[in-house]
Amino acid sequence: MSTSADTDTIKKPILAVPEPALADTHSEEISRSGEEHESENNEHSDEEGDNYSEREQSVSTEPLDTLPLRKKLKNLSYITFFAIGIGLLWPWNCILSASQYFKHDIFKDTSIWAKIFTSSMMSFSTISSMLFNIYLAKRQYKYSRRVINGLVWEIIVFTVMCFFTILHFLLPKWFNFMFIMMLVVISSMGTAMTQNGIMAIANVFGSEYSQGVMVGQAVAGVLPSLVLFALAFIENSSVSTTGGILLYFFTTTLVVTICVVMFSVSKISRKVNENWNVEDGHITDVLLGSLRSNEEEIRIVGRIDQMEDEDHRRTNGTRDDNDEGEELQLKVPFEVLFAKLKYLVLSIFTTFVVTLVFPVFASATYVTGLPLSNAQYIPLIFTLWNLGDLYGRVIADWPMFRDQKFTPRKTFIYSLLRVAAIPLFLMFTAITSSSSGDEEHNGSVIVDLCYMLLQFLFGVTNGHVISMSFMKVPEQLDNDDEKEAAGGFTNIFVSTGLALGSIISYVFVFIIDFIIR
């Protein structure tokens, strides 16, 4: 009986772990040894804490969720999540913002390929992303590997895109169209893989890291559209356009490569190995000084590492007897997640369905009074929308929106109210299509400015709802298994909302075509 009790005690994750053999025969000696060790640790805890803070500057001693954004960006772990957020959405926004180049330079505006390009690109991207997210969500492991693998896929896609920009004129339009769609599918799968992995990790780290990913995604929307807006003022020649787009795609490759480097340098999934010594499931006293200041992050990453080490053993054919049971234990049923997250995932779904009409209107509503060409005005609209999206994601961190009184149900209602913007978009499209050729149209500048304001506010509401929804996910869950599984589960609703929104966008293409005629 005594042996059993002592063994149970040893299994607990305590810091000073006695040898199991001594537990049966020398309990008094162990007690004295533990007291001496604790006394020694108290004498040196300050020194060890200082050394640890010098080694791990990425960990803030202050609660991260209470810090302003500029201070959060000094935290290496946070800025890594932020950078990967940029790498997540930059490729998508790069292709979306370059729609005018594809339609004008490759498909020559009037061809059937030019007319269906934007909607087809969104459909191929979102449907493939949805199917791949469903596949990933059922496999709740290898999250860190997914982050790296997805980013590598993006690097390959945009390297190929650079060569395609130079050689596309040698190929027929139909082949160019199908080849671009294939690259879009691979890119969307890479994005899905990275997002699935990083959101699973961010959910466990805390809502502030989820917000870091969201803000990074918004920055990824702003920067490519700013670049394209600047390129619109370059002399309109075939050589300058090709050179500008080539630089545009190369920049995307560079951005994603930086994300890979940062993820490796920050060692989000591996840095615990420098501070732990795990033997037979017991934590040794190497962390006595540092565990106090970094206990939560170490617990999180250590668990992720343990899962990935088990996966590595499986792939090398060295399965433990209980591996099968451990893998099954990791899987959280979707019914459990939906019961806890239904309002949040429905908010995400609704927001993206409504948002996907934005590119159709943005590329079909023309300037009427401002001294800009349509080739300059359309990138400006994309830029304003993305600036609004960024602002919405930043203000989601305000205390009033993180308060428990702003419930998931209120967030869902908020997402439904965005539908009211669609009739306004139709109205502006009708106004600008009837007056775009009339240089003396009264109040046309005001119409342009009002439309720009509408697009900015539409972007604000998109970023606001999405960021709040993802930040509230960890708060609704009870344990780390659920939080990790929620990364893939929420991505299903992201991709499903985008897929349905892209299909609905076809309807608005024909409605807009009817209005313009």
Swiss-Prot record:
UniProt-annotated stretches for the region Disordered: 1-63
An annotated GO BP: nucleobase transport
Short name of any one Pfam family annotated for the protein: Nucleoside_tran
Bias type Basic and acidic residues, positions: 25-44
Annotated InterPro entries: ENT1/ENT2, Eqnu_transpt, MFS_trans_sf
Xref: SUPFAM superfamilies: MFS general substrate transporter
Topological relation to the membrane, as annotated: Multi-pass membrane protein
Record-listed Phosphoserine modification sites: 45, 58
Intracellular or extracellular location(s): Membrane
Keywords tagged on the record: Membrane, Phosphoprotein, Transmembrane, Transmembrane helix, Transport
Origin superkingdom: Eukaryota
Molecular-function GO terms, alphabetical: nicotinamide riboside transmembrane transporter activity; nucleobase transmembrane transporter activity; nucleoside transmembrane transporter activity
Transmembrane spans: 76-96, 116-136, 151-171, 174-194, 214-234, 243-263, 344-364, 367-387, 411-431, 446-466, 492-512
Role summary: Has broad nucleoside selectivity (uridine, adenosine and cytidine) and most likely functions to transport nucleosides across intracellular membranes.
Additional detail: Present with 217 molecules/cell in log phase SD medium.
PANTHER family: EQUILIBRATIVE NUCLEOSIDE TRANSPORTER (PTHR10332), EQUILIBRATIVE NUCLEOSIDE TRANSPORTER 1, ISOFORM A (PTHR10332:SF88)
UniProt family annotation: Belongs to the SLC29A/ENT transporter (TC 2.A.57) family.
Protein name: Nucleoside transporter FUN26
Organism for this UniProt entry: Saccharomyces cerevisiae (strain ATCC 204508 / S288c) (Baker's yeast)
Higher taxonomy: Eukaryota, Fungi, Dikarya, Ascomycota, Saccharomycotina
